[in-house]
Amino acid sequence: MRVAVLGAGYAGLTLVKRLEDALPDDEVVVVDEDGTHLVQHELHRVVRRPSLVDDITLDLGDVLDRATVREATVTDVDPDAGIATLETPEGAETLDYDAAAVCLGAATNFYDLPGVEDHATPLKRIGHAHAVRAEFFTAVEGATAADPARVVVGGAGLSGVQVAGELAALAREETDPDAVEVVLLEQLGSVAPSFPENFQRAVRDELETQGVTVRTGTAVASADAGGLDLANGERLAYDQFVWTGGIRGPPAMDGERPVVRNTLRLGEATFVVGDAGRVVDTDGQAVPASAQAAVRQARVAADNIERLLDHRRDGGNGFEPRLDGYRFDSPGWLVSVGDGAVAQVGPTVLTGRAAKLAKTSVGAGYLSSVGAVANAVDLVREELGWPDEESGEPGADGRSGGDGSDDGGEGPVRVTIDDGDDSD
């Protein structure tokens, strides 16, 4: 039998690796536009450190054992017929399957706000990160403390928080920080509005410590080449505009994120996993779009696909097998803010060195879990400033090694959570 995994983000890659083990006699096909996996929750780092691209981009052929990788764009999915339509360099093709999972992630939602899509840069792909970096240097050229450049980030979910923090850090590193104003806008009453209040407060404090101007209760109504019209009637000029204001479904789903119940089942043998759908868990709660949710949903989907195919192999007689339900239970949240970080583990909020160690641990742990151990080591070295074993050169924060105790910070923290509010 053939199982198709459409997309290779957090959900797709986790699912494929589990299916390779669970279904050794079945064909597993993963469809991805360019045959790579992007560690999305580290993408903002590329804005400041382009060298990280190699650490957070994985060739699927290097981390998969036997699955077939098809480089194509999924343009349509018929969940009842069991057919996916693909666009390849040779033209349109169809892919029939016995079971499938739609793991296509989400696209940036511009909400049809006039001019926003035309004038803002999103942050979903490597090319976007490079564009944000290039636009930053164009924006700040010639800026002075008396006449500063204004960089506006629209949307203060975790993605917006991270890119705003990174741009503020870039300003400190590459120019006079007084010559750049980084402004983070959020239409709701707090940053990270989907998260607990103590986490929100800590994130806002960290942003302001890093020099970011935070404006909550401020909605964008429209944009043009020179500025934003805000919903309150104010005109806000900008030199650079980045948009992280929300997500929508992938084009293959007509921009929709279908609602699925906790079994993640969309059709007879088609499942939706990760940000491509709106999942209602076993407690009846809507699941937030996040990397950790996508990974955990993939585990449930893998078990359910295995049960359905085993049932068919046994003749398909009698009742269908009982499928597992997904329950969202987050052990905590993490977000980077420039060189700092904020972590929430249970009711406890961590900042400073402990939070950064937790954040780096999560990123490296995820890379190791999908078989990219060398990438994990490189990421830790880059993030924590450990020296390169061959050159002895310090990493990004200039440290030359040591046991991590020289700054009075806490030791390594192991936290099995992911950050990010749009995971792909």
For the regions a protein language model found, what residue spans apply to each?
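FAD-site-proximal beta/loop scaffold in flavoenzymes
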Residues: D118-D147, G226-G227, R235-R307
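A Rossmann-like FAD-binding core segment of flavoenzymes
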Residues: D25, V69-D80, L95, R172-N262
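C-terminal, flexible cofactor-proximal segment of oxidoreductases
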Residues: L23, Q297, A302-D424
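Catalytic nucleophile loop
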Residues: G9-G12, G157-G160, A294, A301-A302
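Beta1-alpha1 glycine-rich phosphate/pyrophosphate-binding loop at the start
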Residues: M1-R70, Q162-F195, S400
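FAD-binding core/adjacent interface of flavoenzyme oxidoreductases
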Residues: A67-A149, V242
